[in-house]
Each structure stands twice: as C-alpha cells, then as structure tokens.
Amino acid sequence: MKLKKAERRQAIQKAIELNPFITDSELCEQFEVSIQTIRLDRTNLSIPELRKRIKLVAEQNYEQIRALEANEVVGDLIQVEPNISAQSLIEITEESVFTKTQIARGHVLFAQANSLCVALIHKSTVLTQESNVAFIEKVKLNDTVRAEAHVVNKTSHHYVIEVNSYVRDTIVFKGTFKMFYISEDE
C-alpha cells in the first residue's frame, strides 16, 4: 500500500535520519516509488544527496584524527571512536578498477583499511608494522565499500586492529593490522 505524499516524505526523512547512508535506489524499493519521486521528496525536505550527506558526516569526524590529515584518509570517515573503533566509506570509481574487468584493484581496499587503522589511533605518530589480509569477494565499479575497524588488543606501543569491509551486507575484505605508535611525550 502506497503512502500519501506527506506521510511518505515524513517516512523518508525518518529513514534517512536512521541511516544517513541509505541510497535513493534503496528508498525507491522501500517506498515503491520512482527515483524521481524520491529526489523530489528529498529536495522538498532539504535533504542533500547521498554524497553530500557522507561528506557532512565525514567532516565532523576528521577533527578527531591526530596521525593523518583529513586528505590522507582513503575514503570518507563516517564514524570514529578514538582508540576503539572507526568506519569509512569509499565509492569505487573508474580510477580504482582494472579497465578490462571493472573489478577494484586490491590496493584500494587495503589502503582504505590501513588508513582507517591509522585514523582510529589517537596518537601523533602511527605506522603499520604488519598486516594479514584476505580479499573475500570481488568489488566492482560503482560499489560502495564500508570498512569497519575495531581494536582487539593494545600494548605499550602497539594496537592490533581487525578490519572487515563490506559491499552492502557481503564481506569483501578482512584484515588484521598490527600498528606501532609513539606518544607525544616520547
């Protein structure tokens, strides 16, 4: 059963508040309307498109990073709890894929995960000491990859961080990173 325009707009606003990373296509499916209708409703509600919503969330999180400049993070940092966990998103573009197969280059997924680990640690100097990674599924042109990093262990100069990357709900990459850090007072 389709909702009336006012009810649908209210429901769209609530859906985006609950998940600011929901796509217009996903909203189309959820509310059984065309993409043009979703775009008109978003415009009427003064809700920016997905890319702008991601950038707004990312800008708020960059302030919490100490070891990297915002432009050094691969992907958009969408959540960071210093020394505990972080998440980022990256859209796979033409520059990120092999021309013939349209499959993402592995170093892009690795760079997203690795820079997320550096951004997560709230120290001035953070370096990757070792990593163990696995590429689980292929990632294609225009996919959006969500990387989630969680600290699993901390010692006097190291963090061990697990990273899982997803396209929608499918895991595409996983890795364990041992990160070396130096405190400012050292």
Curated annotation (Swiss-Prot):
Domain MaoC-like: start-end pairs: 98-168
GO BP: any one term: negative regulation of DNA-templated transcription
Superkingdom of origin: Bacteria
InterPro entries named among the record's database cross-references: HotDog_dom_sf, Thioestr_dom, Transcription_factor_FapR, WH-like_DNA-bd_sf
GO molecular function ontology, one term from the record: DNA-binding transcription factor activity
Keywords, comma-separated and alphabetical: DNA-binding, Fatty acid biosynthesis, Fatty acid metabolism, Lipid biosynthesis, Lipid metabolism, Repressor, Transcription, Transcription regulation
Keyword Nucleus: no
NCBIfam families, per the entry: PRK04424.1
Function: Transcriptional factor involved in regulation of membrane lipid biosynthesis by repressing genes involved in fatty acid and phospholipid metabolism.
Homology family: Belongs to the FapR family.
Protein's name in the database: Transcription factor FapR
Gene (name only): fapR
